């Protein structure tokens, strides 16, 4: 089992800067818990790739989608940056589709993007961003003054999308969890999702 810890800073907003580098990934197994990767830019959601070869993780304030090769004992190899995000874009949640592409939710910019792990190409699939809001948050981020109040107001219906999960017949829809919304949103998807590994646990147990 792998878990992410976003920051060692107190308050956590002290790491809401381009210099964020205190996040880490913890590996938990029969030998206990230990740090498997360190020095990351505000580690957020992580997932094992469908082929089981890599652990993918969003570095929210590092503004990167990164991955680590997985060894058989669960340890992680050297980090590889798959995609970097631009002004006003902060990656949060992620999920894989049936074609091995990575879907990433972007807070502040209120976007849903699809990343090709082979080329690093980022395709914008859903965009509700407010350019004025994005510019204001970007300025505070660069100045090292970004605070909770800056992120507390919704500027679109997506309202800071922080997670997604494929659902429905053929996995052709997705639920979006949004930090500032009072509901979970369901959107149609152009491609089927990849079933998460835990869906097969009961089958494996039998």
Where are these regions (language model features)?
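Beta-rich, blade/repeat-based domains predominating
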Residues: 1-2, 7-9, 19-25, 34-54, ...
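Short loop/turn segments immediately following the C-termini of beta-strands
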Residues: 6-8, 60, 70, 107, ...
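Short, solvent-exposed loop/turn segments at conserved positions within beta-propeller repeat blades
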Residues: 9-23, 60-63, 107-108, 180
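A short loop-to-beta-strand structural motif that recurs across blades of beta-propeller domains
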Residues: 23-26, 64-66, 111-113, 183-185
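Flexible "stalk/tail and boundary" regions
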Residues: 26-30, 113-125, 129-132, 139, ...
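Beta-propeller fold detector
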Residues: 35-38, 76-84, 122-131, 135-136, ...
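Short loop/turn segments immediately following beta-strands, especially the blade-tip
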Residues: 68-75, 115-122, 187-198
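Blade-level signature of beta-propeller repeat domains, shared across WD40, Kelch, NHL, RCC1
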Residues: 158-206
């Amino acid at each position: 089992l792998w878990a992410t810890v976003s920051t060692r800073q107190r308050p956590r907003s002290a790491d809401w800067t381009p210099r964020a580098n205190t996040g880490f990934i913890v590996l938990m197994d029969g030998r206990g818990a230990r740090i498997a990767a360190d020095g990351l830019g505000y580690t957020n959601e992580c997932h094992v790739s469908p082929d089981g070869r890599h652990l993918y993780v969003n570095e929210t304030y590092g503004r990167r989608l990164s991955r680590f090769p997985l060894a058989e004992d669960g340890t992680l190899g050297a980090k590889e940056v798959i995609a970097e995000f631009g002004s006003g874009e902060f990656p949060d949640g992620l999920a894989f589709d049936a074609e091995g592409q990575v879907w990433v939710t972007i807070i502040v910019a209120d976007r849903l993007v699809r990343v090709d792990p082979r080329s690093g190409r980022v395709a914008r699939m859903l965009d509700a961003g407010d350019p004025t809001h994005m510019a204001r948050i970007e300025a505070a981020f660069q100045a090292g003054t970004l605070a909770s109040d800056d992120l507390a107001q919704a500027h679109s219906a997506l309202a800071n999308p922080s997670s997604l999960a494929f659902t429905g017949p053929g996995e052709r829809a997705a639920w979006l969890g949004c930090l500032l919304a009072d509901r979970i949103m369901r959107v149609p998807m152009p491609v089927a999702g990849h079933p998460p590994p835990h869906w097969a646990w009961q089958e494996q147990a039998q």
